[in-house]
Amino acid sequence: MAVQQNKKTPSKRGMHRSHDFLVAPQLSVEQTTGETHMRHHISPNGFYRGRKVLKTKNDE
């Protein structure tokens, strides 16, 4: 098992942990329907960047 040779200082420990935070998801509003969805994902009603790309159960 690996064992550190020297103790890591509080500064280095903080730098090591600097990217361990949680980030809120990026949300976007669909321009045709006004529905909120995650960026670069299809909205729940099947639209992506203003175009219908997926058939849903509610389609006729």
UniProtKB/Swiss-Prot annotation:
Residues 1-60 are annotated as: Disordered. Belongs to the bacterial ribosomal protein bL32 family. Residues 49-60 have a biased composition (Basic residues). InterPro entries: Ribosomal_bL32, Ribosomal_bL32_bact, Ribosomal_zn-bd. One of its GO terms (biological process) is translation. HAMAP family: Ribosomal_bL32. Keywords: Ribonucleoprotein, Ribosomal protein. GO terms for molecular function: structural constituent of ribosome. This is Large ribosomal subunit protein bL32. GO terms for cellular component: large ribosomal subunit. The keyword Ribosomal protein applies. The gene is rpmF. Transmembrane segments: none annotated. Pfam families: Ribosomal_L32p (PF01783).
